[in-house]
Amino acid sequence: MVSSRKCVFLVFLCMVVLLNPKSTKAKDIDGRKPLLIGTCIEFPTEKCNKTCIESNFAGGKCVHIGQSLDFVCVCFPKYYI
């Protein structure tokens, strides 16, 4: 019962992220945390990296998160020393 509630919550969360048009453009919130911007179907590897770089991140990569989710585009922050 608990796992089905988690599944429903994750599906709902994914739908909100995917249906929100503002979530498709990466935003540098504080420049320190990786940011998930969408699925790799929406952002193929080349477009994922390019979108992240254009949004002031160091780069982006399609990564697999968990068993129930497909590959998602994650932007990695720039670190300044």
From Swiss-Prot:
Principal subcellular localisation of the protein: secreted
Record has Signal as a keyword: yes
Biological process terms in GO annotation: defense response to fungus; killing of cells of another organism
Stretch forming the signal peptide: 1-26
Cross-referenced CDD domains: DEFL_BmBKTx1-like
Keywords: Antimicrobial, Disulfide bond, Fungicide, Plant defense, Secreted, Signal
InterPro entries in the record: Scorpion_toxin-like_sf (IPR036574)
GO CC terms of this entry: extracellular region
Record-annotated disulphide pairs: 40-62, 48-73, 52-75
4Fe-4S recorded as keyword: no
Name of the protein: Defensin-like protein 32
Organism for this UniProt entry: Arabidopsis thaliana
